[in-house]
């Protein structure tokens, strides 16, 4: 639209708005006459007028929550990865924690059996069917000797991510402050941003063996409590940690619960990788601590333990007030996971658990191959005690370029895709996350590619 036409559209727009301000049913003929007169005088196509009106109106609309979200840095690597594959390149993909193995057959069989029952195809229950919540209670009793009230302290979720985001939506008031480790699984911080809250980032420092530097972590919490206004209302913890693989022992949670009770904040614990452990390590639960239910909830997912990532099943348990808030918001938002999936998940949690050890053994072997072959290639990495990741510091010659540019370079030159550490927080920029989702031979091939890349 030229400048002259724009001026005429603006003239028409202002006059029409003036006419509409005095609009009454009995004056409709006058308004129509005004429109026809203005069109004739200005010699304008009606489409230009409509486009101008809506462009002006919609340009004024802002989406404040979306504006607060940072750019999703993983998208840049994903786009580059797809471009390489479209060009015919063989990309070895360690970028996403997406299990590549099959769901154990007895779980699949139960799903099929349940699907073949017509009554299971209707709406389900937003908090999860009672049998699944009972299975969650059985799992916690067997693994942690923790008793749960199935009606007040357990909600089944569509994966742990859905449950976490909806919990945060339910409990966050505008301006509430949450303490979140950095680096962290991105939604752990961004859920509070979406809910209108704010985030105080706690630097996650590790010991040489990648256990958590607990002294430093508690020091950072105490500083946040002392210096922040308003005082933090929530703390998020995630061990075994994604992305760093950091682990803790039960005394860590005992001290954390004591501080939370004293300082009056809630703890949201994520133990998504609780079963993927190696070398005798056993993941503790915060709910093992006496009195933890006063201040804490905990989430878990079947995605990694049973290779059920696409099934979208998890649960959240613990503090009855927080669980009640999650249950209430879910009652408005969904009707629960497809019932046959819940039935099959019940079997997963309660029947033969040998499949869990088999899946864990697959990751242990991959871990050993990855650590050994990467070190031999000239990239020193630390062997994790848990999770499906290796948190690898960028080799010294490339560290100054940052994790995003290094990830791009590794992809284009070595044909190996990893996740840049900056995507998990500013303190992760010296690292990349490597997911153990390719088989052992592919891992060895990646190491050969990396060795050549580092030498060049």
Question: Where are the language model's segments positioned?
Answer:
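Methionine residue identity
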Residues: 1, 34, 40-41
């Amino acid at each position: 639209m030229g400048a002259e036409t724009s001026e005429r559209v603006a003239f028409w727009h202002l006059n029409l708005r003036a006419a509409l301000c005095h609009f009454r049913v009995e004056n409709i003929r006058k308004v129509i006459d005004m429109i026809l007169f203005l069109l004739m005088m200005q010699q304008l196509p009606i489409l230009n007028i409509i486009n101008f009106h809506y462009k002006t109106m919609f340009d004024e609309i802002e989406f404040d929550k979306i504006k607060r979200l940072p750019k999703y840095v993983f998208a840049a690597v994903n786009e580059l990865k797809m471009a390489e594959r479209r060009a015919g390149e063989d990309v070895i993909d360690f970028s996403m924690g997406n299990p590549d193995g099959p769901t154990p057959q007895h779980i699949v069989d139960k799903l099929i059996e349940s699907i073949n029952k017509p009554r299971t195809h209707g709406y389900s229950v937003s908090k999860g069917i009672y049998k699944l919540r009972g299975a969650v209670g059985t799992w916690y009793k067997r693994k942690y000797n923790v008793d749960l009230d199935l009606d007040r302290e357990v909600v089944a979720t569509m994966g742990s991510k859905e449950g976490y985001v909806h919990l945060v939506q339910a409990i966050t008031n505008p301006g509430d402050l949450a303490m979140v480790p950095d680096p962290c699984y991105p939604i752990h911080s961004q859920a509070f941003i979406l809910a209108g809250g704010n985030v105080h980032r706690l630097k996650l420092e590790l010991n040489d063996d990648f256990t958590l530097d607990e002294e430093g972590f508690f020091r950072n919490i105490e500083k946040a409590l002392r210096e922040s206004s308003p005082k933090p209302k929530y703390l998020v913890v995630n061990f075994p940690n994604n992305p760093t693989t950091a682990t803790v022992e039960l005394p860590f949670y005992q001290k954390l619960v004591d501080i939370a009770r004293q300082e009056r904040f809630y703890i949201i614990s994520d133990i998504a990788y609780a079963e993927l452990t190696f070398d005798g390590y056993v993941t503790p639960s915060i709910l093992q601590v006496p009195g933890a239910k006063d201040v804490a909830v905990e989430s878990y997912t079947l995605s990694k333990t049973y290779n059920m990532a696409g099934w979208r099943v998890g649960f959240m348990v613990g503090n009855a007030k927080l669980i009640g808030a999650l249950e209430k918001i879910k009652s408005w938002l969904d009707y629960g996971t497809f019932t046959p999936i819940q039935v099959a998940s019940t079997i997963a949690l309660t029947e033969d658990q040998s499949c869990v050890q088999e899946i864990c053994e697959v990751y242990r072997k991959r871990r050993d191959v990855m650590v050994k072959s990467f070190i031999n290639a000239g990239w020193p990495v630390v062997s994790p005690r848990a999770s499906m990741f290796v948190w690898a510091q960028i080799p010294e010659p490339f560290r100054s370029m940052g994790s995003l540019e290094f990830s791009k370079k590794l992809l284009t030159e070595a044909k190996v895709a990893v996740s840049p550490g900056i995507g998990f927080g500013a303190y992760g920029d010296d690292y990349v996350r490597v997911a153990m989702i390719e088989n052992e031979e592919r891992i060895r091939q990646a190491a050969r590619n990396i060795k050549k890349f580092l030498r060049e």
